[in-house]
C-alpha cells in the first residue's frame, strides 16, 4: 500500500487573477498527456476555453470562479491538481481547498511581482506550514529584474527563496533559462502546443557563447555566481517544512520552463502528509480509510441537478461499494459510482488511495467538513467559513418558481459559495458574500441552472459574527436587547448582524461574557 501512497502528489495552484495560473494548469495537463492542445486561455479569436474552467459563467467571464480538480499520471507519479479561483471574491473556496492539499505552486507575474491575493493565500499556507514552489511567469514579456523579484518574494511572502532556474533576459530579448538544479541551459522556443526539445549546454564551455552570444554568456556567468553567493543551497527538508521556496522562471503560455518545474516538483514535493482531527493525528499509511469533504459542487451536469461532494482521502484505501461510516449522520453508506476528474470528464473509480480526491454523488447528504471513516468517530479540523463582507436581501422575482428558487439557494449554499442568514426580526433571507462578483454568480446560476429568478434588496450591514456564551441567561438577555440585529445561520446558530463597527464594539463592551466569532468551522 505504501508505494501507492508514496507516488501521490496532491497540490493546488494559486495566484492573483491573471498571473497565468490556468495557463500553467493546462500546460501541466499537456505534459501529462491529458490534452493535446492547451485551451489558449484568453484568446476569443480561437473559440476554445480553458479546459479547467468548466462552468458556463467561467467561460463567459474568462475567470475561474470554482475550484477544478484534475488528475493524471506522469513518470510513475499520480498527480492531483486543484486549480483554484484567483479572483478575490472567491478566496474562501481557495482557502478551503488549501486544507485538502499537501503542497502548493504559487504563480507570480514577472512584470507585476507579488500582488494582494498572493499575499493572503501565502498567509494560509504559512498557518499550515504548506511547502511552496514559486513559478515566475510571463518572462517572455518585459519583467522586473530577477534579483529585485526574489527580494520582493522574500519580503512580501516572508519565506526564504532559492532560484532553481535563472532567466536570460526578458521580453523580446528573452533567450531561455539556465537550470541550476541540473546545470543545463534551456533555450526559449515559443510553442503553445508541442512540447519543445531542450537544448542542453554546459555553462563553462564556449558552446554557451555560441548559443546566446559572448556578452550575454558573460553576464549569465556573473549572475549565476552572484546567485550562489547570495542565496543558500536548496534544502529539501526546509522546503518540506514550509521554510524555503524554490523559484522557477518561465512562460506558461509558451510552454517554457514548465517541464523543469514539473520534473523537480514530482521529485521534491511531499507525498500525502498526516492530517489533524479533533481526536488525533491521522497518518496516510494507516490501513483504514478516512476522508473529509472540503467542497461541494452543484450541477456538474445541468441535465441531472446533481451535486458532487469532493472528498480528500486522508488514510488507507477507498473501495467502491464498500460501506463507510458518515460521522455526522451516525450511519453507514455505500457509494456505487465514485468518480475522479479531468475537469469536466468524470470516470468511475473502483479504488483510490490516501492523497486522492474523489467525487461522491450527493443528494443533500453532505456538508463541507463531513468525515467518512470505517467506524471511528473523527472530526477533521480547520475548514472555516469566514464572516462575510457584503450583504443583500434575496427576494423571489418569479412567484411561480418558489420551489426552484428554494432548491437553488439550498444547493448553492451547500457549496459554500455564500452564506444564508434568516433575520429573526422580519424573517427575510440575507445572503452574505466575500465580494460583489458572488452575487452576480448566484443570480446567473439560479437562472441558468435552476430556472429561478431572484432580485437583490439593499441592507446596510458591517459584519456578521457568530455568538455564544457559557452563561445561557446572558445570551438570552443579549438576544432580547439586540433583537433587530439577530439572525440564524443554516445550522440554526445565533448570528449577530452589526450595522457598524461602533454597534459591534458597544455590544462587546456591554456583554463581557458573550463570545463573538468571526469564523465558524463548518
For the regions a protein language model found, what residue spans apply to each?
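Structural and coupling elements of P-loop NTPases
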Residues: 1-522
Amino acid at each position: 500500500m505504501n508505494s501507492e501512497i508514496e507516488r501521490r502528489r496532491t497540490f493546488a495552484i494559486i495566484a492573483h487573477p491573471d498571473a497565468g495560473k490556468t495557463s500553467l494548469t493546462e500546460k501541466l495537463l499537456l505534459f501529462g498527456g491529458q490534452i493535446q492542445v492547451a485551451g489558449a486561455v484568453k484568446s476569443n479569436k480561437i473559440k476554445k476555453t480553458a479546459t479547467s474552467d468548466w462552468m458556463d459563467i467561467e467561460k463567459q467571464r474568462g475567470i475561474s470562479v470554482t475550484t477544478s480538480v484534475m488528475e493524471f499520471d506522469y513518470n510513475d507519479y499520480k498527480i492531483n491538481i486543484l486549480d483554484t479561483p484567483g479572483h478575490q471574491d472567491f478566496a474562501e473556496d481557495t482557502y478551503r481547498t488549501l486544507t485538502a492539499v499537501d503542497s502548493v505552486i504559487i504563480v507570480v507575474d514577472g512584470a507585476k511581482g507579488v500582488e494582494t491575493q498572493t499575499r493572503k493565500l501565502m498567509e494560509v499556507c504559512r498557518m499550515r506550514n504548506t511547502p511552496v514552489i514559486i513559478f515566475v511567469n510571463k518572462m517572455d514579456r518585459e519583467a522586473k529584474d530577477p534579483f529585485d523579484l526574489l527580494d520582493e518574494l522574500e519580503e512580501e511572502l516572508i519565506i526564504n527563496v532559492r532560484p532553481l532556474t535563472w532567466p536570460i533576459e526578458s521580453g523580446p530579448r528573452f533567450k531561455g533559462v539556465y537550470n541550476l538544479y541540473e546545470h543545463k541551459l534551456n533555450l526559449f522556443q515559443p510553442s503553445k502546443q508541442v512540447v519543445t526539445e531542450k537544448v542542453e549546454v554546459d555553462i563553462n564551455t564556449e558552446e554557451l557563447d555560441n548559443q546566446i552570444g559572448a556578452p550575454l554568456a558573460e553576464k549569465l556567468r556573473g549572475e549565476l555566481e552572484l546567485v550562489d553567493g547570495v542565496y543558500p543551497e536548496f534544502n529539501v527538508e526546509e522546503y518540506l517544512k514550509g521554510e524555503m521556496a524554490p523559484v522557477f522562471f518561465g512562460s506558461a503560455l509558451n510552454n517554457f520552463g514548465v517541464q523543469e518545474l514539473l520534473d523537480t516538483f514530482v521529485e521534491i514535493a511531499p507525498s500525502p502528509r498526516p492530517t489533524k482531527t479533533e481526536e488525533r493525528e491521522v497518518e496516510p499509511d494507516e490501513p483504514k480509510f478516512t476522508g473529509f469533504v472540503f467542497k461541494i459542487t452543484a450541477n456538474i451536469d445541468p441535465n441531472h441537478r446533481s451535486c458532487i461532494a469532493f472528498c480528500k482521502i486522508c488514510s488507507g484505501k477507498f473501495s467502491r461499494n464498500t460501506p463507510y461510516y458518515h460521522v455526522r449522520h451516525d450511519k453507514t453508506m455505500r457509494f456505487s459510482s465514485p468518480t475522479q476528474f479531468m475537469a469536466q470528464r468524470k470516470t468511475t473509480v473502483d479504488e483510490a488511495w490516501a492523497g486522492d480526491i474523489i467525487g461522491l454523488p450527493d443528494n443533500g447528504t453532505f456538508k463541507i467538513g463531513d468525515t467518512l471513516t470505517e467506524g471511528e468517530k473523527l472530526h477533521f479540523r480547520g475548514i472555516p467559513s469566514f464572516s462575510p463582507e457584503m450583504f443583500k436581501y434575496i427576494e423571489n422575482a418569479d412567484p411561480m418558481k418558489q420551489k426552484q428558487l428554494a432548491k437553488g439557494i439550498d444547493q448553492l449554499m451547500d457549496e459554500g459559495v455564500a452564506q444564508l442568514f434568516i433575520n429573526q426580526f422580519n424573517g427575510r433571507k440575507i445572503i452574505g458574500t466575500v465580494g460583489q462578483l458572488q452575487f452576480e454568480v448566484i443570480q446567473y446560476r439560479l437562472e441558468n441552472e435552476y430556472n429561478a429568478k431572484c432580485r437583490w434588496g439593499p441592507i446596510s450591514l458591517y459584519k456578521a459574527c457568530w455568538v455564544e456564551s457559557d452563561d445561557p441567561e446572558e445570551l438570552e438577555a443579549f438576544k432580547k436587547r439586540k433583537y433587530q440585529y439577530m439572525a440564524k445561520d443554516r445550522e440554526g446558530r445565533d448570528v449577530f448582524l452589526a450595522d457598524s463597527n461602533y454597534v459591534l464594539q458597544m455590544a462587546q463592551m456591554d456583554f463581557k461574557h458573550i463570545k463573538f466569532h468571526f469564523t465558524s468551522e463548518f
